[in-house]
Amino acid sequence: MNSIKFPVLDRTTKNSVISTTLNDLSNWSRLSSLWPLLYGTSCCFIEFASLIGSRFDFDRYGLVPRSSPRQADLILTAGTVTMKMAPSLVRLYEQMPEPKYVIAMGACTITGGMFSTDSYSTVRGVDKLIPVDVYLPGCPPKPEAVIDAITKLRKKIAREIYKDRIRPQQGNRCFTTNHKFFVVRSPHTGNYDQELLYPPSSTSEISTETFFKYKSPVSSHELVN
């Protein structure tokens, strides 16, 4: 009867086997292959375009820009977002597969920027529409800052638990406050009060009736006499 013999492990076997968890393997594969969907609407996006060149070379981080949201797991918003563009941004985010991430790049995307001071159509922060993972302030941020934001996102992905990241699809989070308009009477009726437009000088002795009875240009000598 043959006895059971256990195989003898070679010394090099220990160096060939990696013990890890499925969660760590999933995080490692995702952080090394981020496929961004570029949503640029203003000047901040020009700084991100500098990363494509050989000086910064963002391909070394595994970034492959995609034109379809169904093939992307990262959306990078750069520039001003208006109320009219908000539903389109939310729709693009909802079409992305889970897990998905968002980087808000620039002051206009984070807070609305200088365009939100007296504007009724500017969204004051893209986080009112979609959840943001990394905020990148600046006007505009430098390409080095964009690389730092991507590095921070990669560290966040490496620490997260895949089961907790997947969440049910949320409804429309678009900021849809109804605007109330009140009809007021226009002050521009075409009839102007000439006494308010051309008030006579307080030191002049010319009466108002004398000042406005001349419809055609007259000389100052005729006006006084």
From Swiss-Prot:
Protein name: NAD(P)H-quinone oxidoreductase subunit K, chloroplastic
Superkingdom per UniProt: Eukaryota
Record membrane topology: Peripheral membrane protein
Gene that this sequence comes from: ndhK
A GO biological-process term: electron transport coupled proton transport
Coiled-coil residue spans: none
Residues holding [4Fe-4S] cluster: C43, C44, C108, C139
Keyword Isomerase: no
Entry note: cofactor: Binds 1 [4Fe-4S] cluster.
Keyword Oxidoreductase attributed: no
Annotated compartments: Plastid, Chloroplast thylakoid membrane
GO molecular function annotation: 4 iron, 4 sulfur cluster binding; iron ion binding; NADH dehydrogenase (ubiquinone) activity; quinone binding
Keyword list, A-Z: 4Fe-4S, Chloroplast, Iron, Iron-sulfur, Membrane, Metal-binding, NAD, NADP, Plastid, Plastoquinone, Quinone, Thylakoid, Translocase, Transport
Enzyme class: translocase
